[in-house]
């Protein structure tokens, strides 16, 4: 059977307001332009969406991260509904940062599983596929009843640090949940060793680091996590490894959320450099510290979209050659 030939005339890429620069970069890598759409507010504050060209029979990709405020998620849902009602052939929700992902299970009585609720909403709205980057928990893929591609930026971040040629690097997981990610990252850094923090969380905002397993004395530490929220975990870990004789401390994560006063706290912290990606519009943040470096996931997402359209393997993007 001959593969169906996909032309870019059959593809439409839309974006909401959550991260327009990333969406523009993704379209550019595909030699396309974003399809015109109105995504604004009615006078009463409700979300207004209207696609300004036909999507009938087209493969539609909607690029929208779902970070706070909740309007970003609602924009995505309404855009999906709009193109579904306009007879799109397929609708892929491209969600570089998937909000509410930390609420993937009940940790206390009478709590919601918000990640599952959001997955249900996206599916019910009419999405036929989801593409995301470094979900907080890989099992969130199972919350969807449609194909879900969980891309990873670990190779992008790993390449950056590999080219720094740090002497005596040690990759440190700031908590147990980051171990698998740190292990994958360490494989990208020649001669890197590993260490892990075992911590006790006192509350969602307050973290007590209890024990470090591994050797960091005289080494350059790279703290690896999936996202930076308040930064408290990384700052606490950085102070501890320096107390134990580490030379310098770097930190990296896919998603730079930087909640509350985290940027100020991280700027004043002993961390030498913080490397994140543009799944969120970090570069538009006011007073962004010079120590924060932003790498782009646009080529990664664009290549995944191309492979999906050409019916090629997406997982091969992350396989060792």
Predicted ranges, named:
Residues 1-321:
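PRPP-associated nucleotide enzymes
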């Amino acid at each position: 059977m001959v593969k169906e030939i996909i032309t870019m005339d059959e593809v439409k890429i839309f974006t909401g307001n959550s991260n327009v620069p990333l969406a523009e970069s993704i379209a550019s890598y595909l030699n396309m332009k974003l399809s015109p759409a109105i995504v604004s507010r009615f006078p009463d504050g409700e979300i207004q969406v209207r696609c300004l060209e036909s999507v009938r029979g087209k493969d539609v990709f909607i690029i929208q991260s779902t970070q706070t405020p909740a309007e970003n998620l609602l924009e995505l849902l309404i855009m999906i509904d709009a193109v579904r009602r306009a007879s799109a052939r397929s609708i892929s929700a491209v969600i570089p940062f998937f909000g509410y992902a930390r609420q993937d299970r009940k940790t206390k009585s009478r709590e919601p599983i918000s990640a599952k609720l959001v997955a249900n909403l996206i599916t019910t709205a009419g999405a036929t596929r989801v593409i995301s980057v470094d979900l907080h928990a890989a099992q969130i893929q199972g919350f969807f009843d449609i194909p879900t591609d969980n891309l990873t930026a670990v190779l992008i971040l790993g390449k950056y640090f590999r080219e720094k040629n740090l002497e005596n690097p040690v990759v440190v997981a700031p908590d147990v949940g980051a171990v698998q990610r740190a292990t994958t990252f360490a494989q990208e850094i020649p001669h890197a060793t590993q260490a892990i923090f075992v911590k006790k969380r006192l509350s969602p905002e307050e973290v007590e680091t209890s024990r470090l397993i591994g050797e960091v004395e005289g080494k350059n530490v790279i703290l690896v996590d999936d996202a930076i929220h308040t930064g408290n975990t990384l700052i606490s870990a950085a102070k501890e490894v320096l107390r134990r004789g580490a030379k310098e401390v770097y930190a990296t994560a896919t998603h730079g959320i930087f909640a509350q006063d985290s940027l100020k706290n991280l700027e004043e912290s002993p961390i030498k450099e913080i490397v994140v990606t543009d799944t969120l519009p970090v570069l538009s943040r006011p007073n962004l510290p010079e120590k924060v470096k932003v790498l782009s996931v646009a080529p990664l997402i664009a290549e995944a979209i191309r492979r999906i359209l050409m019916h090629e393997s997406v997982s091969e993007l992350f396989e060792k050659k």
